[in-house]
Structure formats: structure tokens, C-alpha cells
């Protein structure tokens, strides 16, 4: 769509997702067997035919660059691009100091694109959104800035920017991560929170970024500085994400912050439900990604018993022999020997599980080799001596580990 530029913030360190982010940035973390977190933001743009996109990277970006080079290279098509941009350090030898600073340091790229509107989106949430619908709302309201928002249980709202709106959808209050969030009028158990997705009029954005960069007292963040400064003018509006409609979708809108191990695990379990709230199979909203050239998954019986695959996702290149896999996600090239019992677990790919292993509520990062007869997730006290165990008891095996040898 001419006149619209996408800026995707993909520099997140993802400290709460460690050890999955020890060797990769948060947007590069695998999800759902075949995907990376960045894919969902990119698909929201591409499926809305918004094909001029800069992806701003920062921490441990090599894995992300590799994925985008193989799966998202559309360069060569006139006026269409998806370009990853590493931190430029144009304002000094320093990393991005906040979300607004990340955009400001790439002001030159935006100006060269001559956009009318700039869409600034995050890259670490699981959801589908037709951005054209939000863009139409933005134009109808003649907004300087539009912020997408959703209802959030009041108990969880303090982790987000909390919004107040009037009857016309105009923002009349905003507080970033308040300790005592305000509830929605008439809906006392919920708050209206920012999704961290913004559409700016380009001239307004450029002026705000330049002014903010000159303010020594600013933290250079959209939620902490730019939005609180802008909304009292009356031209900041709020787009209700619950009104967004995706062709071919039956379920209500789905949005998950997967910033913790427990949330990441739960989002995978959501994929495996009979009526999954987030579907990977909507042909009218394809989820593009890089797919390595691999043969189909193979399932064979063994002398130890028949193979059983129940409520699970198994990716190409995987080989499961005479084992039981239930409510689990097996990434590319997962090799499961016979007599294993794996349940409610996530294998990120290139994982070898030896004969007779038991895995319960385990996340296994890439390139892991688990010795025959190993039990993980059965005795959490023992697991804590070796692995990271989350608050909800999810065991995480780090990338490249050799377990039980």
C-alpha cells in the first residue's frame, strides 16, 4: 500500500525468556514448530498488503538475520522490501535507549521512503491483525496517532500502558505500567491496555522524535514519553483490537504476550486444543515463514510398542519410533527413539531423545541430545539442580545440551 511504511521493533533482549534467549534475540525464538516470533508481526503486514517494512534489530541478531534472509527476502520487487536494519548508532556509540529512540535513530531511512503514515509495531506477541482496518480507523478519525488496545484482566494490567477513552475513541488518559491500573467504566475487572502498536502521521512522528531526542529528561520511550505528551491535544485515538476481523477466522481475537517461559509454554498448549483459539490453518490468512527442504515426518512402530501421536504438532524431518507423544510440539528434525513418553512438551528442533525417556512439561531448545532412560519433569527438585525451572514448573533444557551422559 503506497504511502505507508512499517517499522517493526525487533531488538528485544528477552531476559525473562532465558535460557531460550541466551544465543538469540527474543523475536528469533522459535514458536509453533515452524515459526519464529517475528513471523507473526511480519505476516500481519504482508497479509494486509503493507510491503514496505524495516525491521529494527539489536541484541544477538544473527539468528534473526539468517531467518529473514531465507524466509522474507522480497527485494527486487519495485517499491516493496522487508529489510532488517542493525542498530546504526547514528547518535553516538550507544544502543537504543528506548522504543522512541530506536525509531529516531532510523529517521533517515523513514525520510527517504517519504511515507504519509508510519506503522510502528512490536514483534514478540502471538496474534493476527489486519492492519488495514486499523489504518482505516486512523484515517477516518483524522488522528495524529492511533494506538491499538485490548481488554486485559485488571490483575495483569500493570504490565502494560493503561488507557482511558471517551465515547468517540479519543484517548483521554494514559499511564505506563501503573501500580494501580484504572478499570474500564462499567467493567470493573478489566482495564484497557496498549498493545504497543502505533500508527502515526509521518510528519507528526518526525517532529515528535526530533523534539524528544533533544529532551535530556526523556527516557525516549513511546509509552513513557511520547504518548503522555501527545494525548492531551485531542488528536490521539484508540483502535479497539476486538473489532478486528480476519477472513476465515471463527474464534474471537487472540493476543498473547509470550515474554515469560510460562506464557510461552501456555501459548503452545493453546495451539493444541480441539478448538484452538489461535489457528495455524487459515488458508485465507497464510502464515509465511522459512521452511527448510525436509521430508515429511515419519512414524513407525517398534518392538517396544506402537507409536501414538495425540493432540500434537510434528514438523517435517522428524522421526518417531514406537513412542507416545501427547499434547506436544516437535520442531524440525526431532528424532524420538522407541518407548519414550513425551507429554505437554515443546521440542524446538534438531533434538535427539534416546530410548525409554520420559519428558513432562519440558521445553527443549535446539541441538539437544538426551541419553536413553532419562526422566525430565518427573522430579522437579532434582531438575532444579541442573536446569532452569519456571514458577509454574516448566523445565527448560538449553541449546546444545547433552543430558544424562
UniProtKB/Swiss-Prot annotation:
Pathway: Glycan biosynthesis; glycogen biosynthesis. Alpha-D-glucose 1-phosphate binds at residues 96, 161, 176-177, 194. Its EC number is 2.7.7.27. Coiled coil: none annotated. It catalyses: alpha-D-glucose 1-phosphate + ATP + H(+) = ADP-alpha-D-glucose + diphosphate. Belongs to the bacterial/plant glucose-1-phosphate adenylyltransferase family. It is an enzyme of class 2 (transferase). GO terms for molecular function: ATP binding; glucose-1-phosphate adenylyltransferase activity. It holds the Pfam family Hexapep_GlmU. Homotetramer. Keywords: ATP-binding, Carbohydrate metabolism, Glycogen biosynthesis, Glycogen metabolism, Nucleotide-binding, Nucleotidyltransferase, Transferase. One of its GO terms (biological process) is glycogen biosynthetic process. Involved in the biosynthesis of ADP-glucose, a building block required for the elongation reactions to produce glycogen. Catalyzes the reaction between ATP and alpha-D-glucose 1-phosphate (G1P) to produce pyrophosphate and ADP-Glc. InterPro entries: ADP-Glc_PPase, ADP_Glu_pyroP_CS, GlgC_bac, GlmU/GlgC-like_hexapep, NTP_transferase_dom, Nucleotide-diphossugar_trans, Trimer_LpxA-like_sf. This is Glucose-1-phosphate adenylyltransferase 1. It comes from the Bacteria. It comes from Vibrio vulnificus (strain CMCP6). The keyword ATP-binding applies.
Amino acid at each position: 500500500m503506497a504511502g505507508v511504511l512499517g517499522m517493526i521493533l525487533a531488538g528485544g533482549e528477552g531476559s525473562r525468556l532465558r535460557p531460550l534467549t541466551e544465543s538469540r534475540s527474543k523475536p528469533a525464538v522459535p514458536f509453533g514448530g515452524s515459526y519464529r516470533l517475528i513471523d507473526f508481526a511480519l505476516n500481519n503486514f504482508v497479509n494486509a498488503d503493507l510491503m514496505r517494512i524495516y525491521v529494527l534489530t539489536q541484541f544477538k541478531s544473527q539468528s534473526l538475520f539468517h531467518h529473514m534472509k531465507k524466509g522474507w527476502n522480497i527485494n527486487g520487487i519495485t517499491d516493496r522490501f522487508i529489510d532488517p536494519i542493525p542498530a546504526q548508532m547514528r547518535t553516538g556509540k550507544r544502543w537504543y535507549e528506548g522504543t522512541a529512540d530506536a525509531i529516531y535513530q532510523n529517521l533517515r531511512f523513514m525520510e527517504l521512503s517519504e511515507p504519509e503514515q508510519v506503522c510502528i509495531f512490536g514483534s514478540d506477541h502471538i496474534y493476527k491483525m489486519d492492519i488495514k482496518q486499523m489504518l482505516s480507523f486512523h484515517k477516518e478519525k483524522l488522528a495524529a496517532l492511533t494506538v491499538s488496545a485490548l481488554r486485559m484482566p485488571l490483575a495483569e494490567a500493570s504490565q502494560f500502558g493503561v488507557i482511558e477513552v471517551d465515547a468517540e475513541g479519543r484517548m483521554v488518559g494514559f499511564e505506563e505500567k501503573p501500580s494501580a491500573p484504572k478499570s474500564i467504566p462499567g467493567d470493573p475487572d478489566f482495564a484497557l491496555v496498549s498493545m504497543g502498536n502505533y500508527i502515526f502521521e509521518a510528519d507528526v512522528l518526525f517532529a515528535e522524535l526530533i523534539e524528544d531526542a533533544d529532551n535530556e529528561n526523556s527516557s525516549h520511550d513511546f509509552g513513557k514519553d511520547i504518548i503522555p505528551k501527545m494525548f492531551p491535544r485531542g488528536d490521539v485515538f484508540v483502535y479497539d483490537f476486538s473489532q478486528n476481523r480476519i477472513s476465515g477466522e471463527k474464534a474471537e481475537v487472540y493476543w498473547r504476550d509470550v515474554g515469560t517461559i510460562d506464557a510461552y509454554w501456555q501459548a503452545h498448549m493453546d495451539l493444541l486444543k480441539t478448538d484452538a483459539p489461535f489457528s495455524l490453518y487459515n488458508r485465507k490468512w497464510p502464515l509465511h515463514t522459512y521452511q527448510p527442504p525436509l521430508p515429511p515426518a515419519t512414524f513407525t512402530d517398534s518392538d517396544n510398542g506402537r507409536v501414538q501421536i495425540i493432540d500434537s504438532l510434528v514438523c517435517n524431518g522428524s522421526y518417531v519410533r514406537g513412542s507416545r507423544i501427547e499434547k506436544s510440539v516437535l520442531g524440525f528434525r526431532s528424532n524420538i527413539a522407541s518407548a519414550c513418553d513425551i507429554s505437554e512438551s515443546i521440542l524446538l528442533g534438531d533434538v535427539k531423545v534416546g530410548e525409554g525417556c520420559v519428558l513432562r512439561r519440558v521445553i527443549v531448545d535446539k541441538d539437544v541430545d538426551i541419553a536413553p532412560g532419562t526422566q525430565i519433569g518427573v522430579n522437579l527438585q532434582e531438575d532444579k539442580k541442573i536446569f532452569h525451572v519456571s514458577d509454574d514448573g516448566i523445565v527448560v533444557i538449553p541449546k546444545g545440551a547433552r543430558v544424562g551422559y
